[in-house]
Amino acid sequence: MVIDTSALVAMLSDEPDAERFEAAVEADHIRLMSTASYLETALVIEARFGEPGGRELDLWLHRAAVDLVAVHADQADAARAAYRTYGKGRHRAGLNYGDCFSYGLAKISGQPLLFKGEDFQHTDIATVALP
């Protein structure tokens, strides 16, 4: 699976559906995250919880054995195409900059996307069904 910022923020913020996201992560042995999404997640978490939140993020990623995938040209191209098709102001999915990197990694890896919200369900990307 590819983990989007929205899912990881839900888990680290202990939102009501956090356990469902955690169960989905535990059920899949492939756990990928774009380094662009990692930065986006760190910015959100540290804005909410300060540097201790950032340390908790890094610890969570380590314990969950999430593979941070560097942004290369193929991921960037897929992200760019996602914005062209599904970007905010262009399509009802309304993908933002960070969303496009999650989409791009899911597209090039062939892995389903774990996310919170309704944006990605309006795209052609495979998604993770929550337990």
From Swiss-Prot:
Q: Carries keyword S-adenosyl-L-methionine?
A: no
Binding of Mg(2+), residues: D4, D99
Superkingdom per UniProt: Bacteria
What does the UniProt keyword field contain?
A: Hydrolase, Magnesium, Metal-binding, Nuclease, Toxin-antitoxin system
Question: Into which EC class is this enzyme placed?
Answer: hydrolase
Q: Name one Pfam family in it.
A: PIN
Residues covered by the PINc domain: 1-129
Instruction: State the EC number(s).
Output: 3.1.-.-
Which cofactor(s) are needed, names only?
Mg(2+)
In terms of CDD domains, this protein maps to: PIN_MtVapC28-VapC30-like
- Family the UniProt entry places it in: Belongs to the PINc/VapC protein family.
HAMAP family per record = VapC_Nob1
Protein name, entry field = Ribonuclease VapC30
Taxonomic source organism: Mycobacterium tuberculosis (strain ATCC 25618 / H37Rv)
